[in-house]
Amino acid sequence: MNSKIEEMRITLIETAQKYGMNSKETIQCSQELDILLNTRIKEEMIFGRYLENSRM
């Protein structure tokens, strides 16, 4: 997951440099990165809860 996030982050930067910050291409990349980051956060929260429950 980390490599996908890093790849999308680089793509976002390159897209913003090429098309501008407010272009539809940049916004699309930003939204895709948001999805990856939100998924990562949810996974960490679920995994963290699993670890807490397994210690009981």
UniProtKB/Swiss-Prot annotation:
**What functional role does this protein have?**
Aspartyl-phosphate phosphatase which specifically dephosphorylates the sporulation transcription factor Spo0A-P and negatively regulates the sporulation initiation pathway in order to control the proper timing of sporulation.
Q: Which GO terms describe its molecular function?
A: hydrolase activity; protein dimerization activity
- Top EC class for this record: hydrolase
Mention one GO biological process in which this protein takes part, according to its record.
regulation of sporulation
Similarity comment text for this entry: Belongs to the spo0E family.
Which keywords does this Swiss-Prot/TrEMBL entry list?
Hydrolase, Sporulation
Induction context: During exponential phase and in conditions antithetical to sporulation.
For this protein, what is the EC number? 3.1.3.-
Which protein are we looking at? Aspartyl-phosphate phosphatase YisI
